[in-house]
Amino acid sequence: MEKRKIILDCDSGHDDAIAIMMAAKHPAIDLLGITIVAGNQTLDKTLINGLNVCQKLEINVPVYAGMPQPIMRQQIVADNIHGETGLDGPVFEPLTRQAESTHAVKYIIDTLMASDGDITLVPVGPLSNIAVAMRMQPAILPKIREIVLMGGAYGTGNFTPSAEFNIFADPEAARVVFTSGVPLVMMGLDLTNQTVCTPDVIARMERAGGPAGELFSDIMNFTLKTQFENYGLAGGPVHDATCIGYLINPDGIKTQEMYVEVDVNSGPCYGRTVCDELGVLGKPANTKVGITIDTDWFWGLVEECVRGYIKTH
């Protein structure tokens, strides 16, 4: 089986932690590095969260700090969902794990330029790191095999009626990525909201056990509370983990090719991913957009990854 080489670019909230856990353990994925961006919380907090997850699960992958601010807009955070730390819920041991000294954007550029065009970028937070890398060194564009991202929606947003948080947090960066010409796969809210993690799923992962089962439980029990308080949902969707699911087995997720444009005009639609689902604009599709996911398959995959952290010796 071919291992997909990926760089996981994240803002280290609750669903990001599940994505890290899956990407680092599944045999179909070769996780080269983790790059951190500001998003769910400020960069200092998202960096600590990423390092904490790696330390707890003994994930020996280099971690790089990236963009602390969006390209243009005023910074926003999602503390209503992810809490004051950006990863409220779990209690971690004192942190000894350290980030690399290289900036995430430089790491992305250098790694892609040295590659054979076989690396996939997996941004599951705001697209600031990816966009700045593209602008700093446009020669990386043909080197990117694919970008599989979590963000946007062809229906309703979750941070404004129009916009999903990751895109709204840096719409200008998203505009750069969506106009780059690189093959794009978008896991938007329409798809990711199908992965609502209800108490029975949490109990299933607790039964699976090990450090990842414990972390999953602590993370998703907190998310259960904030998702109900903010959106009335019966559980928290694990948005970002769907990107890892897609990379492991694209057949588990139905996609549709669409032309997608990011609205960067100020107003009520700022940050919206305008998806031409019906093809009325007549423009060539630039994105595969996630439509539906086989949730039985997906939770089975998550459990498989959780069990991978159980030590047998």
Swiss-Prot record:
Task: Cite the binding residues for substrate.
Answer: Q227, H239
Per UniProt, subunit arrangement is: Homotetramer.
**Can you quote the record's cofactor note?**
Binds 1 Ca(2+) ion per monomer.
* Family, as annotated: Belongs to the IUNH family. RihB subfamily.
Q: Which domain of life is it from?
A: Bacteria
Q: Which residues bind Ca(2+)?
A: D11, D16, V124, D240
Indicate the enzyme's highest-level EC class. hydrolase
**Cited function:** Hydrolyzes cytidine or uridine to ribose and cytosine or uracil, respectively. Has a clear preference for cytidine over uridine. Strictly specific for ribonucleosides.
Protein name per its UniProtKB record = Pyrimidine-specific ribonucleoside hydrolase RihB
User: Which Enzyme Commission number(s) are on file for it?
Assistant: 3.2.2.8
Q: Name one GO cellular component term.
A: cytosol
Keyword vocabulary terms for this entry? Calcium, Glycosidase, Hydrolase, Metal-binding
NCBIfam families membership: PRK09955.1
User: Looking at the keywords, is Metal-binding present?
Assistant: yes
Known CDD domains for this protein? nuc_hydro_IU_UC_XIUA
The molecular function terms of the Gene Ontology recorded here are: calcium ion binding; purine nucleosidase activity; ribosylpyrimidine nucleosidase activity
Q: In its UniProt record, which GO terms are filed under biological process?
A: purine nucleoside catabolic process; pyrimidine nucleobase metabolic process; pyrimidine ribonucleoside catabolic process
Q: Which cofactor does it need?
A: Ca(2+)
Catalysed reaction equations from the record: a pyrimidine ribonucleoside + H2O = a pyrimidine nucleobase + D-ribose
Annotated catalytic residues: D11 (proton acceptor)
